[in-house]
């Protein structure tokens, strides 16, 4: 991974595919690696009742031949076919290997971040740069290729096409020529959704990243608007060095996009999924309280049962209660995700949520209502979600600050008195011992 290459975490791939919703046509991944975007897109199309090999045509470019072979094998295992080109002739910086500029229905990618020493002259001759070249250094090289990739992804799309890709977080706010390109890009009205991702989503690197989404076929509701989602604090911990989005978290983030697009029926369908799992009798909040109490009781019951079990039965009892607690915890997690979504959007009306999501206009001219609205132009063309969504309000924990401080003060005085008593006792003992 010295030149920025690393494989894409599955939950990021799923997020990209879920938001783009591929159905039919040409899908290009110009930095295809092991083919994760193709596999997930194939699954998405097949699960919708279609045949991915019949409705989709998969094209990939991959500079590293080994990765290209891995991609083809991976696709074959999943019953997919595609055209993958490898080697220097498939280096996307210098070659449109499939001649797909302006022809793609979908572009998905996780390109290597912050690549340097890209030959500027070769890039210019390879075209696909509708907004011009990024900054060029004295050696006639592009010092950071992030905006080459961003330009390519946009250029490959046909009218009505959609793109989704992973990018280094720094690209949302980089300056110089990058900022000029970003302004031109935003003014097209085709930047659709921006998502900030937290640390530790990658297996080998802890860096934060962003997901970018373009749509050259926006509906009237989203024309001249962008949705910003700051999901840096929304994830499931897998282990000390790895985070991910669970299936329900992916659906919840996707639901925000549905409501932004005016697709309320999809949101209602998700609520019904939650009700199918949890039941309709009680609110999500009530079920959280009930399940939390059940888990507490189950732990107490498990402790007693294991203590009272014979030596030969202890392991069996432990396994039995581990399974019970795991099942209860799984349901509790579903209830928490249901409540997370419902308390924000209720029966399906989009609203800006401080610290989570914000809809902004592209330009000052596009703003049709001034109250509470903001444009990307007035934020100096930044695409950093955190600059728009703000900070989530601090939840009231029900503790009176003054009372709690007085209580802490009393505790400190008590500890101080105890400390003084102990010091006196120690000194007295040491004197008696002649020390």
Mark where each language-model region is:
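Conserved S-adenosyl-L-methionine
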Residues: 2-109, 114-125, 132-136, 147-148, ...
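ABC ATP-binding cassette signature C-motif
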Residues: 433-435
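A conserved structural/catalytic subdomain of Rossmann-like adenosyl-cofactor enzymes
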Residues: 101-431
């Amino acid at each position: 991974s010295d030149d920025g290459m690393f494989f894409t975490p599955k939950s990021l791939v799923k997020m990209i595919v879920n938001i783009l919703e591929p159905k039919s046509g040409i899908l290009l991944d110009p930095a295809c690696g092991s083919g994760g975007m193709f596999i997930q897109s194939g699954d998405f199309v097949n699960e919708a009742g279609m045949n991915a090999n019949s409705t989709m045509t998969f094209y990939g470019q991959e500079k590293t031949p080994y990765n290209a072979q891995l991609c083809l094998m991976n696709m074959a295992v999943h019953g997919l076919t595609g055209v993958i080109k490898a080697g220097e002739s498939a280096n996307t910086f210098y070659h449109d290997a499939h001649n797909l500029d302006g022809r793609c229905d979908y572009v998905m990618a996780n390109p290597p971040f912050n690549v340097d020493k890209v030959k500027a002259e070769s890039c210019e001759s390879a075209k696909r740069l509708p907004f011009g070249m990024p900054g060029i250094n004295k050696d006639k090289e592009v010092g950071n290729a992030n905006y080459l990739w961003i330009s390519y992804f946009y250029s490959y799309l046909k009218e009505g096409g959609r793109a989704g890709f992973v990018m280094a977080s720094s690209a949302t706010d980089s300056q110089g020529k990058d900022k000029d390109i970003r302004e031109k890009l935003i003014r097209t009205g085709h930047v659709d959704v921006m998502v900030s991702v937290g640390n530790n989503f990658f297996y080998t690197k802890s860096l934060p990243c962003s997901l970018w989404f373009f749509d050259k076929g926006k509906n009237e509701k989203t024309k001249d608007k962008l949705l910003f989602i700051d999901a840096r604090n929304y994830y499931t911990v897998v282990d000390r060095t790895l985070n991910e989005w669970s299936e329900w978290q992916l659906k919840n983030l996707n639901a925000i996009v549905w409501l932004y697009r005016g697709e309320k029926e999809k949101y209602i369908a998700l609520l019904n999924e939650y009700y199918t799992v949890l039941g309709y009798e009680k609110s999500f909040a009530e079920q959280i309280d009930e399940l939390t109490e059940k888990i507490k009781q189950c732990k107490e019951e498990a402790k007693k049962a294991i203590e009272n079990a014979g030596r030969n039965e202890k392991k069996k009892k432990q396994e039995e209660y581990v399974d019970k607690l795991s099942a209860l915890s799984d349901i509790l997690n579903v209830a928490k995700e249901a409540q997370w979504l419902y308390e924000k959007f209720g029966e399906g009306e989009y609203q800006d949520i401080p610290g989570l999501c914000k809809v902004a206009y592209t330009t000052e001219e596009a703003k049709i209502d001034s109250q509470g609205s903001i444009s990307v132009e007035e934020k100096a063309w930044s695409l950093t979600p955190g600059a728009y969504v703000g900070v989530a309000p601090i939840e009231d924990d029900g503790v009176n600050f003054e009372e709690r401080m007085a209580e802490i003060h009393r505790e400190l005085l008590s500890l101080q008195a105890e400390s003084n008593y102990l010091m006196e006792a120690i000194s007295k003992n040491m004197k008696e011992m002649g020390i």
